[in-house]
Amino acid sequence: MSQPPLDELQWKSPEWIQSFGLRTDNVLDYFSQSPFFDKTSNNHVVKMQQQFSQQMPPAPQTARPKAAPSAERQAIWDRYPAYALLEQELAKLKGIEYVLAHVREPDFWVVRKQRRAGDRVTALNDYYIIGANVYQAPTAYSVVQNRLLSTGFHLSAALGAIQRLARFQPGQGAAFVPVEQNSVQPASGTTASSATAPALTAALDGATAGYSDVLTPEMMDRLMLQSLKSTPLYL
């Protein structure tokens, strides 16, 4: 059975959270259990080095990647030095890597997938973790495509409704069939102003009815035929 696209997938692991909890200092470990994580990424390489070689020194407070960080990333590194050390090790490698891009404790994180080539870093995807759920952020192309499809559908429905209401008569030309609108119950504060609304509506309906009685479609057709048969007089 084919797997759904990653941008349509929601993943969570209650068992993992029950065993280890979910906090900022282990959110990347939680993310690495999801199908969004690439097992060939540099994060996995660094993790294997930590587990088997045990050669990584303790994280010093001054350890920082070479690139100048943003204020938000600087705050993450200051509060969680392990992430500063992780990105220092990732900066030595080339390829796919995952970094913690945004933190809003206690239940929202953004993980960024990026490709590193020396000092050049290209963002590929963002993933957001809300509570225990992990999602892939949609691309700008997917968002625009969805909005255009929705706009086209509703525009087509509106044009179809307008076409069904359109009528054409030789004497009167194009017109639209009147549509009855459901009356809306006014609020209690507008009782005085709404009292005159039925009277005004009745007056307008009466005037429209009288006009339609005088100028019927048959009369308009006869007037048009008479105007066609008449001889124009030019001054």
UniProtKB/Swiss-Prot annotation:
GO terms for molecular function: transcription coactivator activity. Its main location: nucleus. InterPro entries: Mediator_Med6, Mediator_Med6_fun, Mediator_Med6_sf. It is found in: Nucleus. GO terms for cellular component: core mediator complex; mediator complex. Signal peptide: none annotated. Keywords: Activator, Nucleus, Transcription, Transcription regulation. One of its GO terms (biological process) is regulation of transcription by RNA polymerase II. Component of the Mediator complex. Belongs to the Mediator complex subunit 6 family. Component of the Mediator complex, a coactivator involved in the regulated transcription of nearly all RNA polymerase II-dependent genes. Mediator functions as a bridge to convey information from gene-specific regulatory proteins to the basal RNA polymerase II transcription machinery. Mediator is recruited to promoters by direct interactions with regulatory proteins and serves as a scaffold for the assembly of a functional preinitiation complex with RNA polymerase II and the general transcription factors. This is Mediator of RNA polymerase II transcription subunit 6.
